[in-house]
Amino acid sequence: MKILVINCGSSSLKYQLIDMQGEKVLCKGLCERIGMESSMITHEANGNKATTPAIFPTHTEAFAEVVKKMTTGDGKVIDDVSEINAIGHRVVHGGEKFQASCLITPEVIETLRELSPLAPLHNPAGILGIEAAKKVFGDIPNVAVFDTAFHSTMPPKAFMYAIPYEYYEKYGVRRYGFHGTSHKYVSYRAAEYLEEPIDRLKLITCHLGNGSSIAAVDQGKVVDTSMGMTPLAGRMMGTRCGDIDPSVVNYLKYTLNITGHQLDEILNKKSGLLGVSGVSSDKRDVEAAAAAGNPRAQLASDMLNYQIKKTIGSYIAAMGGVDAIVFTGGIGEHDADSRAKICHHMDWLGIRVDTDKNANAHKQNKDVVEITAWGAKVRTLVIETNEELMIARDTKEVLGNEGLL
């Protein structure tokens, strides 16, 4: 069976067509600048990759161009869209309504609209993608896979905020967590690599990139995660502040005489590595500046590594131990120096990485590389995440549960 995986932004459409027999990517691509001038599509298939100009007034036209690329020319991988068995959509926020992936119905779409205030930048774009896909692909089943779903196993003591309880009851104010699809994929891949059932493992998964989150996964269930009601919470990120004293918000608002929207822009887009270093939101640029003697860049790097280390320690305490630490995401997979600094002085917890294995992990050309030092009790893994494949797997599972296979 073939599943089309979709990740829609307000002006973009990312896609992969996966043949589930062998879990092979047949093609992938990106439609950019939807609704703007100079729209374009990049399509990769059969060893060819090409970017061509296009006209995308809406996501519907973008999907139509994706179909054209998949069925004609050098990028052809199918004869007709009828060969596609289902479409899996990444949806950022499922709130408490959706604790697992589900078949998309008109009722589901309406509920997603109701949840849009929880993710105003992401859920409306996801709905646009779903509705456009239904127009272009007709009766092909559509499945929603939620970033928040894997974290829905958190107990109330982990997800509740210590504010009046009625705000949770009336407005859904609580910790939800994000990057769930990535955390789920690397958790199961770690269990597979370790040759242990996931329900016997205590894992800490670190998805580190421009956006970063950490999850404590005990026996296959998330018991805590670093992001909160929104992806702004948790560890500092490329441009996001992460956890700060809530009183700072009001203090800055009145001191700077700015609106809530302006403050939101500062905390989401001008903070984190960029705000502290004054150099860049990209960890590589920050590290280069630090190496050149920039003290603020060094501070930003030290802060991030320290915060991640502190979170790992707290999650070990929460779970009463840990079997493996997993690094994934752009920083987690490629930044050996950060991995080394995060794990430094954690020998007393049984965590120690091999210097050579860590430094050469990127050269192994494997989706899982173990960097555990000899004698360390806790295994340390670098795992290449694959959110698209996880979405495809969830989509296939939903079809099976609905009797549509």
Predicted regions and their residues:
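Adenine-nucleotide phosphate-binding core of ATP-dependent small-molecule kinases
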Residues: 265, 272-276, 283-318
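Phosphate/pyrophosphate-binding loops at sites that engage ATP/ADP/AMP, CoA/4′-phosphopantetheine
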Residues: 69-84, 190-197, 312-323
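Internal helix-turn-beta structural module
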Residues: 298, 302-318, 332-405
